[in-house]
Structure formats: structure tokens, C-alpha cells
Amino acid sequence: LAVDGRQRVYVATGGKGRVYRLEKDGSSPKTVFESAAANVTAISVDDRGELLVGTDSPGRLYRVPPDGRAFALLDGPYTQVQAIRPAGNGATWVLAVSPGGAAPSAAAPPAAAPATAPTPQVSTEVPIVAIGDSTTVTPATSGHATGTTSAPRGAVYRLDADGLVDTYWEATGELPFDITVAADGRILVAADNGVVYALEGDPVRMARIAQVPARQLTRIIPRGDRYLL
């Protein structure tokens, strides 16, 4: 679900990749986005009613102007667009993943992705952790140390206000499930094995800032100076 500045509600659906808009007056829902994708997996809307829509099978990102025609901004190697998070500087951060395994090669057809996100195993809170001496900071290209080099399982993309998309970070370790933009501009990533990463800088630096006793962290939600996982 997403709500625009006029308090209209946008509903993403599975089975058929559609987005419906519900007006405040209770009139019949209007289809504002329709595609051949299996599911709409992420949506974001600004105050003007412009939509960003993420899908799976295939994993694409679309822009839908108010009462306009959808066009694709991103058609990458991952099977699912998992999260869309606007930032205060006009940029938008997009998380794309391949839940079933490594991202396919450019020559391979898109792999099928699960229609629903995995069920989280724990609900807890962790404070914001500043990057410092107690935090493990590694180059973004190294990922999580596993003893072998693995193909990326997901990526964070940066969408500029003018529509340009570039790859900011690729996940070669834990599978990422969600992202959020911290007040200081860092991108926080909730991932497999109860791990939370922070991404900052350009070129990007990755810091492992927290770990909780959970198999998966499927959401990270800001609550003041803390986060609900």
C-alpha cells in the first residue's frame, strides 16, 4: 500500500501485476498500472501522485506519471524489486534481489521468484550505531567473508531525480531483504542471518553495524532514533 498527498490509496496486487487507486470518496478502484509481471512487489508514490512500481518475474522498476503511461526505468539481472525508498535529496534508493539464488547472467532468462516475502523469525529493536572503531568497515566489493567469491544476490540502485539509474552496491554475502534511509544519509540494509549493514560514501563503504538472533530480517522500520526489525 501507498498513500499520496491527496490521501488516495494505491494497492499493489499479486497473481496479476497491477496497481489500483482508491479515491477518498469511495468510488470504484481505478487501475493505474498493469503489466505482464507475476506480482507487484514494491510501490512508492509522491505527493503529486507519480508512482514508482517494482515487479517480479521479471524484476523491473517502472515510473508511472499521474494519469500517464508507465515506462521502465530499470530492467536488471535480478528477479525481484524488493523495496523503493525515497531520500530527502531527490534521489530514490531501490533494492533488487534474486531470492532463489545468485543473479542470472545477462544471457539467461529471468528465474522465477517467490510471490511472497519470507516470514520474519523475530521482532526486536536495535539503536542506531555510528560507524566507528567498534564497527567492521569493509570495501563494498568484498561483501561478507565466505572463503569464496560468489555472484551478487542483490543490489542497491540509486535513481536520480532526472531518471538516471546506477548501481550503488552489490550484495555478495547475505541476501538483503529491506533498506531504509537513515537521518544521516546512510542506507541501512536488513539481511539474512540477522545482519544489518550500513552503506555510505561514493565510492560506497559497507559497515556491519548490528546482528540479532534471527535467520532473516525482512523489514527495517525507523522509530525515532531506533529501528524496528
Positions of predicted regions on the chain:
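Conserved beta-propeller blade signature
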Residues: R8-V11, E50-V53, A91-L95, T167, ...
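Short loop/turn segments that connect beta-strands within beta-propeller blades
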Residues: L22-S27, V64-R69, L159-L164, E200-V204
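Short, conserved, GDST-rich strand-edge loop motifs in beta-rich repeat architectures
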Residues: V97-A151
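Surface loop/turn motifs at the tips and blade-to-blade linkers of beta-strand repeat domains
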Residues: V32-A36, L73-P77, Y168-T172, I209-P213
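Conserved beta-strand position repeated once per blade in WD40 beta-propeller domains
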Residues: T41-A42, Q82-A83, F177-D178, R219
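Short loop/turn segments immediately following the C-termini of beta-strands
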Residues: G14, D56, V97-P99, D192, ...
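A short loop-to-beta-strand structural motif that recurs across blades of beta-propeller domains
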Residues: G17-R21, G59-R63, G147-Y157, V195-Y197
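Residue-level detector of Asp-centered blade-edge/turn motifs that repeat once per structural unit
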Residues: V3-R6, V45-R48, P86-G90, V181-G185, ...
